Amino acid sequence: MKNLFLIFFFLVFSKAVFALEDVVMKGEAFDKNNKLVYIETHQFKRLISGEITEIKTEYHNAFGKLIAEVSSDFSKDPFIPDTVFVDYRFKEKQELTYDKDSRVISLKFTDMKSGKIKTNEFKRTGNMVSGQGFHNYILKNFDEKKSDIKFIVLPKLDYYSFYFEQETPKAEGERRFVLKISNWVLRAIVKEIAVDYRIKDHSLLSFEGLTNIDSDTHDSQILKIKMSYPGVDNDKKSL
């Protein structure tokens, strides 16, 4: 009887832990003049822990036109998802593929207008993070004060050393995390990325810094993105 109870408990517990929830998150990106630049809509699956297992994001400009989209699959690694990013304005595709057996990360940039392709690959090392895997990394290290990470910058086909730390939050009940490049020379030209989370449910509230979406003139842009969760009450757990 005891063994049957243990088996039943294990099955129920496992089902609860690995149950997936479908969530939609909307982000509105504003420039320094508080002008809406684009809207991002994230549709993702997550575990009860909040960890994302797969996500698809669409980006529409302020007039509602689809300008880019990205899909991420976390089945091989929670911090380094297989990723495909397409920018329809510039006809460009960026891809990341992770071979779990060889621990090799392959990056690919394709100019779909000319057909030109650039690639790079390297071995996965500890504390390596890519793209939308940053959220999972934050959840895993929510109580850490500071740590060093290697952040993969897909458009550059390379990774850079950053440090990740908590800073004074903007409001009570929130926690702020910042990502700063370690090289002090580059730090003068690369602005930090800051994200705000609600402590009680670990929900993402806002993002500030360099975004993965360039301006219409193909320049980098620093924006503030405000998050909301259509159809989800504020009291319920969000991303």
List PLM regions with ranges.
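Sec-dependent N-terminal signal peptides
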Residues: 4-13
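Sec/Tat signal peptide C-region and signal peptidase I cleavage site
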Residues: 13-19
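Acidic, serine/threonine-rich low-complexity disordered tracts
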Residues: 20-24, 29-79, 85-87, 93-100, ...
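Contiguous hydrophobic, core-forming segments of folded domains
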Residues: 65-138
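Solvent-exposed helix/loop surface patches that form functional interfaces
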Residues: 106-178
